[in-house]
Amino acid sequence: MRTGIIAQKVGMTSVFNDKGERISLTLVKVDDCQVVGHKTLEKHGYNALVIGVKDKKISRVTKPMKQVFANAKISPKTKLKEFRISEEHFIDIATSLEVDHFTAGQFVDITATTIGKGFAGSMKRHNFRGLEASHGVSISHRSHGSTGQRQDPGKVFRGKKMAGHMGCNQVTIQNLKIFAVDKERKLIMIQGSIPGHKNSYLSVKDAIKKISIIV
């Protein structure tokens, strides 16, 4: 199992293939992505690489992290993430990871944070149909209805679908296909959409599940 990389979402575009079919693409940029540290089975109980991206002012780094970056002999990074790996896939500290870490036609898993929607009602948040528009219903047309039962159990059960904060959740989209890799522009073109707003950071790693070909 190889390490993944941290990339930045640039935006979306579309291209046409040989059959005239339109393919939606998400562009992600891989720039200044380096190995910051190692996690070993003997010391930490598992094998992993710590990957960092985007330089950070030294004045904004805590003293413990200053020592970490000093030991790695690299500039401080803004974003850090661990990737579990197998023992044979360790990479030297301070090694840079580029877009050629992946190839066109490969399937990857994308982990990102969804766009925050703020406080949302039940219809937007959970796709409820709402109450009737007339026939005695007033004020509560977009309400979610009853939230509980009676004196017994006398409470609202945990997990009840109600209005609340929507978005800002970490999600993983599996088995997205890489359409092309542009080494000059440091871009990876991925088929389909990816969670998150423009310029947000996400992780790209090899697909963990095999793709079955349907004939």
From Swiss-Prot:
The modification N5-methylglutamine is found at residue 151. GO terms for biological process: translation. It holds the Pfam family Ribosomal_L3. InterPro entries: Ribosomal_uL3, Ribosomal_uL3_bac/org-type, Ribosomal_uL3_CS, Transl_B-barrel_sf. Keywords: Methylation, Ribonucleoprotein, Ribosomal protein, RNA-binding, rRNA-binding. One of its GO terms (molecular function) is structural constituent of ribosome. Methylated by PrmB. One of its GO terms (cellular component) is ribonucleoprotein complex. Part of the 50S ribosomal subunit. Forms a cluster with proteins L14 and L19. Belongs to the universal ribosomal protein uL3 family. One of the primary rRNA binding proteins, it binds directly near the 3'-end of the 23S rRNA, where it nucleates assembly of the 50S subunit. This is Large ribosomal subunit protein uL3. It comes from Rickettsia massiliae (strain Mtu5). The lineage of its organism: Bacteria, Pseudomonadati, Pseudomonadota, Alphaproteobacteria, Rickettsiales.
